[in-house]
Amino acid sequence: MAVVIRLRREGKKGRPQYRIVVADKRCPTNGKYIEEVGFYDPMVEAPQGYRLKLQRVSYWLKQGAKPTETVDQIIKKVSKLETKDN
């Protein structure tokens, strides 16, 4: 099973919000998913616009899940913010 970490769109028209989910590559974008690992609101500035379970993301990456380009950028931003806080 090919697993990807991708965005799942929610919200209103003109006011998008995204859930970061782990899903089978063959499932539709807004279809069934395995696990929700985060949240992204593009209308809110960082760091409030991102919420990510980094432990679960790293688990899925070790299992072979491939993040999309956008999710990969979000993971890098959040991990940079986490290391800056500590």
Swiss-Prot record:
InterPro entries: Ribosomal_bS16 (IPR000307), Ribosomal_bS16_dom_sf (IPR023803). GO terms for cellular component: cytoplasm; small ribosomal subunit. SUPFAM superfamilies: Ribosomal protein S16 (SSF54565). Gene3D superfamilies: 3.30.1320.10. Keywords: Ribonucleoprotein, Ribosomal protein. The keyword Ribonucleoprotein applies. GO terms for biological process: translation. It comes from the Bacteria. Belongs to the bacterial ribosomal protein bS16 family. NCBIfam families: S16 (TIGR00002). This is Small ribosomal subunit protein bS16. It comes from Methylacidiphilum infernorum (isolate V4).
